[in-house]
UniProtKB/Swiss-Prot annotation:
This is Vesicle-trafficking protein SEC22a. It is a multi-pass membrane protein. It is found in: Endoplasmic reticulum membrane. GO terms for biological process: endoplasmic reticulum to Golgi vesicle-mediated transport; protein transport. It comes from Homo sapiens (Human). The modification Phosphoserine is found at residues 6, 8. May be involved in vesicle transport between the ER and the Golgi complex. The chain crosses the membrane at residues 188-208, 227-247, 254-271, 275-295. Residues 2-187, 248-253, 296-307 are cytoplasmic. Disulfide bonds: none annotated. It holds the Pfam family Longin. Keywords: Acetylation, Coiled coil, Endoplasmic reticulum, ER-Golgi transport, Membrane, Phosphoprotein, Protein transport, Transmembrane, Transmembrane helix, Transport.
Length: 307
């Protein structure tokens, strides 16, 4: 079940907790997340104003403004746009209720604990999205997140920045390669599916023509071997474009442009065997699939909430 579990208001300069919800669960996972809360609190001044930390089954999101950070813990499948809309509501209410002088001069932890009442009410509303009266305003937040997605904090970055490098240093060396190998892409669009099918079609056409060229080479003394190579290279390029469209890999965009360049070179070499419409079709499909690969980026955020 997707839901908000807890939230805190923290002063950025020193990590002093100003207010928080008081209904933490006592599970092992939740206790671990409380440690991450404390670690993030010490580093808020060094982080961007909108961040996400993924901790397995839970996500920690926060925003910072005017020296105060608003942090929340939710399940990993809680919609990203709702999470940051929730934080935005906390921020607006806190700024309206307390002036900067009070927050800057606060000495005791949780000196604004009465703000917990608003946190609890808002959390209950956001844990029942159907009852939200602010649905109409979520489109603005959705657009903002797409244009400026939250910075993704890695476990290695969090660990090394807080004096606990021994726990993370071994894994950090290869963390980039491991995470990129298992990185998920954004959901496929209709245009992406069409591009995948067209690329398969071009690959099949190149493959058929390649076998015909082999037959021609066996039946005559013509020098068709280079054409065979061009057809099969074109087939491989089309299939590799399909692979790049479906799976994430390092330097994915660069590879897609190089693959498109190979498709263009193959079709230039096959100019004598194809008419202009055939050449135009193959090159256009290659360009279209390259564009779809570029548009379908890795998932850097949780699923959006439909509005």
């Amino acid at each position: 079940m997707s839901m908000i579990l807890s939230a805190s208001v923290i002063r950025v300069r020193d990590g002093l907790p100003l207010s928080a919800s008081t209904d933490y669960e006592q599970s092992t996972g939740m206790q671990e997340c409380r440690k991450y809360f404390k670690m993030l609190s010490r580093k808020l001044a060094q982080l961007p104003d909108r961040c996400t930390l993924k901790t397995g089954h839970y996500n920690i999101n926060f925003i910072s403004s005017l020296g105060v950070s608003y942090m929340m813990l939710c399940t990993e499948n809680y919609p990203n746009v709702l999470a940051f809309s929730f934080l935005d509501e906390l921020q607006k209410e806190f700024i309206t209720t307390y002036n900067m002088m009070k927050t800057n001069t606060a000495v005791r932890p949780y000196c604004f604990i009465e703000f917990d009442n608003f946190i609890q009410r808002t959390k209950q509303r956001y844990n029942n999205p159907r009852s939200l009266s602010t649905k109409i305003n979520l489109s603005d937040m959705q657009t903002e997140i797409k244009l400026r997605p939250p910075y993704q904090i890695s476990m290695c970055e969090l660990g090394s920045a807080n004096g606990v490098t021994s726990a993370f240093s071994v894994d950090c060396k290869g963390a980039g390669k491991i995470s990129s190998a298992h990185q998920r892409l954004e959901p496929a669009t209709l245009s992406g599916i069409v591009g995948f099918i067209l690329s398969l079609l071009c690959g099949a056409l190149n493959l058929i023509r390649g076998f015909h060229a082999i037959e021609s080479l066996l039946q005559s003394d013509g020098d068709d071997f280079n054409y065979i190579i061009a057809f099969f290279l074109g087939t491989a390029a089309c299939l590799y474009q399909c692979y790049l469209l479906v799976y994430y890999t390092g330097w994915r965009n660069v590879k897609s442009f190089l693959t498109f360049g190979l498709i263009c070179l193959c079709n230039m070499y096959l100019y004598e065997l194809r008419n202009l419409w055939q050449l135009f079709f193959h090159v256009t499909v290659g360009a279209f699939v390259t564009l779809q690969i570029w548009l379908r980026q890795a998932q850097g955020k949780a699923p959006d909430y439909d509005v």
